[in-house]
Structure formats: C-alpha cells, structure tokens
C-alpha cells in the first residue's frame, strides 16, 4: 500500500503547476530508483507501462527539475534492462535530443549522453542514430552542434563495424553547407573521425560534394590522422604527435583543438576530445596496413625549383576553355577554372605573355557566383608565386578586380582573396603596387576600405623597404581622413596603419605628414606602435654606397697630387726640409677664418691639414716635399681654373653649392704607382683659398638648412590654417543647409496659407451671394404680408369693432384683444395666403429670419441680437446700394 501511495503521489506531483513540487517528485523518484535492485521493484511499474510520462520531465521548463528527470531516466534505463529500454526508446530519444542534449548545464548534457549510450548498447542504436541524423539537420544551431558531437562520440565508441558510413557520407556535405561556423567546425571533427575509420573511401564519397577550399583544409587535417581498428573490444583513438589544426571556413577566429598530451610506456600520443562529454580513455593501437594520403596544399610554395621543368600554361587556353567560361551556368565556369588549377600549381612556367590568362582571371573575379571567384583567387595565387618578379607587369590587370571583391562578407572567400593579395606582395613588393592599393582606400564601400587597410598594415610590417615619400604623403593624408570615418572597423584599421608608420619612421618624422590629425587620437596610436615589429627603417641603407664622383661642372677630374721626390730613409736628416715642413704645418693648421665658422668646420679643416702634412711613418718608402708642393699649386693652371669655376658656381648657381663643395673637397687617398719596381705614395693637399671656399659653402649650407626649417614651420602653419578653413567651411555649409531647409519650410507654409486664404475668399463670396438672394426673397415676402386691401378689410375691422364693443360691455376684454389680433394676422386674399405659405415653408438657412421681423424696428433688433458680424452687415448694405 505504501508503494502504491508513493507511485500515485509521484504521478500527481509531476503534473503540478509549482516547479518545487515537481522538483521534489523527481528527486524522490531518483532516490527510489537508486535504492531499487532491478526492474521488479514497484517504482518501475508506472514508467514501464506508460513511458510517455518521461516527456513531462525531460521537457520541463525548470532546469533543476529537468536535471533530476534526466538522471532518473538514466537510472531507470540502467536498471530496467531490456524491458524498460524497449518500452521507453520510442518516447525518450526525441526529448533527449531536442531539450536535454543542447542544455547549457553540463550535468544535464552528461546525463543525456549516458542515457543515449545505454540505449545504443541495448539494441536501440537504430532509434538513436535516426534521431541524431534528423537533429543534425535542424536549423537550430545549438541542437545541431550537440547532435553532431553525439554522433562523433558514438562513432568513436562503436566504430564503422557497428555503424554504417553511408548515412555519414550523406550528412557531412549538408553540414558543410550550413552558414553557422560551429556546425561546420563539428562537421570537420566528424570528418576526421570518419576518415580514421574508412580512409580514402571518405574522399571518394564526400569530396566531390564539397568546395575546393573545404577539401584542401580537410586534406591538411587528414595528414595527422591514423587508422582506427578494433582490437580486443577496445576502440583505438590515436593521432600523430603533431597537433591537428582543424579548418575554419567562415570565422575569423582560429579554433583551438582540444588536445591533451599523455605519456605511456609505448610513447607519447595525443588524444583529441571530440565532444564536451566525458568519455573513458582507451588503449591506443598503432595501425597495421594504413597510410593516409598526402594532403594537397592550396598555396604551398614551390620546392626544388631549380630542378623543376617549366610548364606550358598558355597551351591550356583553348577555345573550349573560353566557351566554358562564357557559359551562363556557374558550374561550367567553375569546372573550366578548376581544370587550370593542376597546371597552374606548378612552380615554374615557360616564358610568355600571360596577360590573356590574367584578364580571364580578372573577369572571373567579378563573377556573381562566389564559388567561381574562390577558384579564380586560387589560380591567381599560384600564378603570382610561379612568376615572381615577372608578375609585376600584370598587377594593373588583376589588382582592381581583386581589391573590389573585398566587399564580400563571406569570410572563406575573403581569406582566398587575401591569399592571392599576399602572393602578389611577396612576388612584387609593396612599393610597386602601392599606387593601386591607395586608390582603393577611397572606395565607397567601407568593407573594401577595411580589408585593404588591414592587408596594407600587414605588408608594411613585413616589408624591408620603406615606402617612397610621395606614397607616404598620400597614405598619411588618406589616413587622416579615414580615422574619422563613420564605420568603426575602418577607424581601427586606420589607427593600426598609422601606428605601423610611426614605428617605421618615428613620430618626429611622421608628424609633418599628419598635420590635420586629431591630437586626442595620437596617444592611442603611439601606444599601439609599441607592440608592433617592423623590418623597414629609414636609416637602414637599402643599397651599398657608391664612391664619390667628380662634379659635373668639370670636364675632367683634377688630381691635386704632388709628385714626391726620391724617398729618404731619414726624413729629419735635412734640416731645411724639416723647418719648411714645420712652417707649412703652422701656416696650414691655423689659417685666418671668418668669425662665423662653426666648430665642426674648424675641426674638419684641422683634420684636413693634419692629414695632408703629417710626417710619413717608418714603413713608407717615400716622403713628399712640402716646399715643392706649396710652390706648385699657384703655378698649376688646372687648379686656378678649378677655383674660378667653383667661385662662379657659388655666385651664379646657389642651388649647386653642394656639388661645388663635393668637387672642392679632396680626401687623402693613397695611390700605388709602379716606377722601377717601387711604390710611391701621393698625398692630396688643399690650399688656403680652398679652405675659405669650403667654409663659405658650409655657411651657405647652414643658412639653407635654417631656411628649410623655417619653410617646414611655415608649411605646417599653412596646413593648420587649411584645416581650420576646411572646418569653418564645413560649418558654414551646414548652416547654409539649415537655413535653406528653414526657408523651404516657410515657403511651404506660405503656400498653404495662401491656398487657405483663396478658399476662404471663395467661400465668403458664396455666402454673400446666398445672403443677398435670401434678403431679396424675404423683402418680397414682407411687402406682400404688409399689404392690406382697401375694401373688405375696413368692413371686417368695423364688424370686429362692433363685436368688440358688445363683448366689452359684457366684460370680456381678453377676447376682444384676441379677436383683434386674429383679424390683423388673417390673410385677405388667396395670393396673400400663398405668399405666407411660401415664406413659412421655405428651407431654413443659417441666416433665415421669420417674416414678421422685417419691420424696421424688428430688423434693427435682429441685427443687434443675431450672431452676424457688423462688418458683414455693412457689406450687405453696400451691395444693396450698388
């Protein structure tokens, strides 16, 4: 009796409106099922006979109640054996997959997973698989993802010997066609697991139904998968020691594979958790006869190029190829382009004109079908990597079409386009394609601007050559405009580009190119630049320095060298020569200089003097004669001609002073000369006039530098003024627009008022005409009513007067007055009666009046009391007079 009462109480409580009552009912049921030994217990009987009762708890809206219901079902299936499973399998699978498996609570998901495993092991696998394949195709992403995870778990636990792969072959292409990235990610995991069981049969059945990029990503993932065989009742679940990178087709986020390292006596293996459910670890067995097929990389770089044979790609451009490209069916166009992929993937091409092929690709990049665009981007990637620098003449053909497709929102297509753009950058460099890139920063589509800025930022970080000055000015001016764009991704991408430029050129150099930048945004740019690493720097020499060349003002170079005398083993043996050397040294080391000479110029002059007149070392084989060199300079016609030329260039050509200075500066050079088998050293000297000329040139250079600094400040001031004027112009335009809007609004109001005025004037004229007609009619009626006949009326009045006298004598005065009134108002003829009837039966109007009020006194009273304005009455009187 107590158990019967318990069952009846539970069955009544699970349908209660209060969630607490339902929670307590399932909690009590769970305790009772845990205490029971098998399905012979009485608490199992209601649920075996009526398994539809489980739907109430599995679909409960309260999460704790649902959790206890799922746990009770798991315990029921575990202890009721085959009898309970057979009764409940057709009722509980659908609620478990729809409500419990996608639940946000982990305990509910685990209990649901365990319940489904029990059903699958108890000869109810067909029900479970049928429900899972149906739930994996639903539109609800969470339910579909949970079902795919459960399928993956069942495939790992039972394997292909127990599960048929054919339903999986039909399901996987459908999953890859879904728009949700999580569904496609789980489809990739399921494909990896299925490939481990069936091998190349997966490619045969599934790859023809997938996109090319999906096939490539799956093949890259299949590299690390090993076969799975059943050994001793254990399911193998092993991967190579390399990490599995799962593909992502429509998400910018990179998925993180759930990999855990495990050490064992047999070696280190990586076990991948394909679902969020807890599954026991199983023993890993190595494959016996299985070899995964090598993956085909889409943009893999060419290897062994030196030994590769050039491929004739242009021979594939047959008339059939062009016919297929012009087909209205997108599949024909896609197949035509795919036929070129194996040929174009070769690393070396034969020499030829590839403009026709690239025009075909550029046209395909504009195709309406995104699949065709993806294949065209793949072809462009292969061609750019194969041609390398030879691709430079064709950049103008494909770059506009390539950048214009950045407007696509499908991330997989954008990734393919970015791969092609990266291949072009690696082949041609950034500076050669900078002009085409900057044009698309002015595009009207914000998505195009965003992706172009992001790609440009990556190129600036990777390139080792600084952009030229003209491109830098254009880029900075565009960035100053785009950083105030209304689209947030454009602003963020522009900020990153400016941060990269700051890291390359430094803030002081870049500040003169971003004059109009908002000062509030500069700190963020500087903060971002600290975390950016670049390879290009402006002070980094891009090419080795060439030796100095003579000035173009001279027809032939002049060597300021003195032929030395015979070498002397003891330079100080000749006292006259030594004294002359000291005198020359004192004369040349302390020349008379202007007061404006800088310290740097003095040090350079001293260095020249000391380098030209110092005594030779002991290892020298000859010594120069200072006296002879001092005397030889004035007598040399070439030197005098050179000085005259330099003075003329200083006076007449101020812009070429640096060239003159380079012509006048002659550094010491050692020139080996063979004369009788001996080498002699030539020393280059400089005269006082040359030193003075050099100081003048340096002063001119300093003055020019000061002028350039002033010009830069003036330029910056003008830029700021231009910016202020532009802001004022924009404000004035806005004010003018507001005023024009106000004026147009007032004009509309005036027009409406004029129309209302015309309508009221017309109505007033109509009212006046109606009043005039009514007034004339009333006057005629009044004249007829007041008209009394000369005969008949007097007789009646006399008769009435007699009767009145008689009645007055009898004292009935009231009747007399009444009789008089009735006589006075009685019509005298038929015409009078008709006039009165017409006056009384006429249609009343707003201004109609009774006929007895048309006497002068009644008219005045009516005019004062009636609701008619005095102005209207005056108008009526004037119209009557007229």
Curated annotation (Swiss-Prot):
Its cellular-component GO annotations read: cytoplasm; cytoplasmic microtubule; kinetochore; meiotic spindle pole body; microtubule cytoskeleton; mitotic spindle; mitotic spindle polar microtubule; mitotic spindle pole
UniProt record, GO biological process: attachment of mitotic spindle microtubules to kinetochore; chromosome movement towards spindle pole; establishment or maintenance of microtubule cytoskeleton polarity; meiotic centromere clustering; microtubule bundle formation; microtubule depolymerization; microtubule polymerization; mitotic spindle elongation
Q: Does the keyword Phosphoprotein apply?
A: yes
Q: What is its main location?
A: cytoplasm
Q: Which cell locations does it reside in?
A: Cytoplasm, Cytoskeleton, Microtubule organizing center, Spindle pole body; Cytoplasm, Cytoskeleton, Spindle
List of residues that carry Phosphothreonine:
279, 650
Region of interest: Disordered: 250-297, 562-678, 809-833
Q: Which GO terms describe its molecular function?
A: microtubule binding; microtubule destabilizing activity; microtubule plus end polymerase; microtubule plus-end binding
One Pfam annotation reads: XMAP215_CLASP_TOG
Q: Which residues does the record list as Phosphoserine (modified residue)?
A: 293, 300, 551, 556, 590, 649
Q: Where is the composition biased (Polar residues)?
A: 266-297, 819-832
Keyword Iron in the entry? The reply is no
Protein keywords: Cytoplasm, Cytoskeleton, Microtubule, Phosphoprotein
Biased composition of type Low complexity is found at 579-601, 609-640
What is the role of the protein in this entry? Has a role in sister chromatid separation.
Q: What is this protein called?
A: Phosphoprotein p93
Source species of the chain: Schizosaccharomyces pombe (strain 972 / ATCC 24843)
């Amino acid at each position: 009796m107590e158990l019967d009462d318990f069952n009846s109480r539970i069955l009544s409580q699970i349908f209660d409106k209060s969630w607490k009552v339902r929670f307590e009912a399932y909690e009590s049921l769970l305790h009772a099922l845990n205490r029971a030994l098998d399905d012979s217990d009485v608490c199992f009987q209601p649920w075996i006979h009526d398994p539809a009762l489980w739907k109430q708890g599995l679909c409960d809206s309260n999460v704790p109640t649902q959790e206890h219901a799922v746990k009770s079902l798991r315990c029921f299936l575990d202890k009721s054996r085959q009898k309970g499973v057979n009764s409940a399998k057709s009722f509980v699978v659908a609620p478990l997959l729809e409500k419990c498996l996608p639940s946000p609570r982990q305990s509910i998901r685990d209990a649901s997973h365990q319940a489904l495993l029990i059903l699958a092991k108890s000869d109810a696998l067909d029900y479970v698989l049928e429900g899972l394949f149906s739930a994996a195709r639903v539109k609800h992403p969470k339910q579909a993802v949970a079902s795919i995870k459960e399928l993956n778990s069942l495939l790992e636990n039972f394997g292909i010997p127990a599960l048929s792969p054919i339903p999986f072959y039909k399901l996987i292409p459908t999953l890859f066609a879904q728009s949700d990235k999580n569904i496609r990610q789980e489809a990739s995991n399921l494909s990896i697991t299925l490939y481990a069981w069936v091998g190349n049969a997966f490619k045969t059945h599934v790859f023809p139904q997938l996109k090319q990029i999906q096939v490539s990503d799956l093949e890259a993932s299949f590299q690390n998968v090993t076969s799975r065989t059943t050994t001793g009742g254990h399911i193998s679940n092993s991967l190579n020691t390399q990490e599995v990178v799962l593909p992502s087709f429509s998400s910018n986020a990179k998925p993180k594979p759930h990999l855990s390292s495990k050490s064992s006596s047999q070696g280190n293996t990586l076990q991948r958790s394909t679902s969020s459910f807890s599954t026991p670890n199983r023993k890993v067995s190595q494959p016996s006869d299985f070899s995964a097929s090598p993956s085909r990389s889409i943009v893999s770089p060419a290897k062994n190029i030196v030994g590769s044979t050039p491929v004739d790609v242009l021979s594939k451009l047959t008339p059939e190829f062009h016919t297929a490209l012009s087909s209205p069916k997108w599949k024909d166009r896609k197949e035509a382009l795919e036929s070129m992929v194996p040929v174009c993937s070769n690393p070396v091409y034969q020499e030829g004109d590839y403009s026709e092929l690239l025009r075909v690709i550029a046209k395909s990049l504009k195709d309406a079908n995104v699949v065709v665009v993806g294949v065209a981007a793949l072809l462009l990637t292969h061609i750019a990597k194969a041609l390398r620098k030879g691709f430079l003449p064709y950049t103008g053909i494909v770059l506009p079409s390539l950048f214009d497709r950045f407007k696509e929102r499908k991330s997989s297509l954008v990734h393919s386009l970015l791969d092609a753009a990266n291949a072009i950058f690696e082949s041609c460099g950034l500076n050669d394609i900078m002009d085409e890139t900057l044009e698309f920063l002015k595009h009207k589509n914000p998505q195009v601007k965003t992706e172009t800025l992001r790609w440009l930022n990556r190129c600036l970080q990777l390139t080792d050559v600084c952009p030229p000055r003209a491109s830098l000015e254009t880029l900075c001016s565009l960035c100053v405009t785009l950083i105030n764009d209304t689209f947030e991704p454009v602003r963020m991408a522009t900020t990153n580009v400016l941060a990269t430029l700051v890291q390359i050129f430094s803030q002081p150099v870049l500040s003169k190119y971003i004059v109009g930048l908002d000062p509030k945004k500069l700190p963020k740019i500087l903060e971002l630049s600290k975390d950016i690493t670049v390879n290009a720097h402006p002070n980094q020499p891009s090419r080795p320095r060439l030796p100095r060349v003579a000035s173009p003002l001279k027809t032939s170079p002049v060597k300021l060298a003195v032929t030395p005398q015979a070498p002397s083993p003891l330079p100080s043996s000749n006292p006259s020569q030594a004294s002359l050397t000291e005198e020359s040294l004192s004369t040349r080391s302390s020349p008379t200089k202007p007061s404006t000479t800088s310290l740097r110029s003095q040090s350079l002059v001293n260095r020249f003097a000391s380098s030209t007149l110092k005594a030779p070392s002991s290892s020298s084989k000859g010594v120069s004669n200072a006296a002879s060199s001092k005397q030889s300079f004035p007598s040399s016609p070439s030197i005098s001609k050179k000085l005259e030329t330099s003075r003329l260039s200083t006076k007449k050509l101020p812009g070429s002073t640096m060239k003159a200075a380079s012509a006048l500066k002659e550094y010491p050079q050692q020139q080996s000369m063979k004369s009788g088998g001996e080498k002699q050293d030539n020393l280059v000297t400089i005269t006082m006039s040359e030193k003075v000329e050099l100081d003048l040139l340096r002063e001119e250079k300093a003055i020019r530098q000061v002028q350039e600094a002033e010009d830069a400040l003036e330029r910056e001031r003008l830029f700021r003024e231009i910016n202020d004027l532009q802001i004022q112009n924009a404000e004035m335009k806005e004010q003018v627009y507001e005023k024009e809007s106000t004026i147009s609004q007032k004009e509309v109001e005036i027009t409406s008022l004029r129309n209302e005025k015309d309508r009221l004037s017309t109505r007033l004229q109509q009212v006046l005409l109606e009043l005039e007609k009514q007034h004339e009619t009333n006057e005629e009626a009044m004249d007829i009513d007041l008209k009394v006949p000369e005969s008949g009326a007097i007789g009646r009045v006399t008769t009435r007067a007699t009767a009145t006298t008689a009645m007055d004598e009898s004292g009935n005065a009231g009747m007399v007055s009444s009789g008089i009134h009735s006589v006075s108002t009685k019509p005298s003829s038929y015409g009078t009666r008709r006039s009165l009837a017409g006056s009384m039966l006429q249609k009343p109007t707003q201004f109609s009046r009774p006929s007895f009020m048309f006497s002068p006194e009644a008219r005045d009273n009516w005019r004062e009391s009636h609701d008619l304005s005095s102005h209207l009455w005056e108008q009526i009187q004037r119209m009557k007079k007229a």
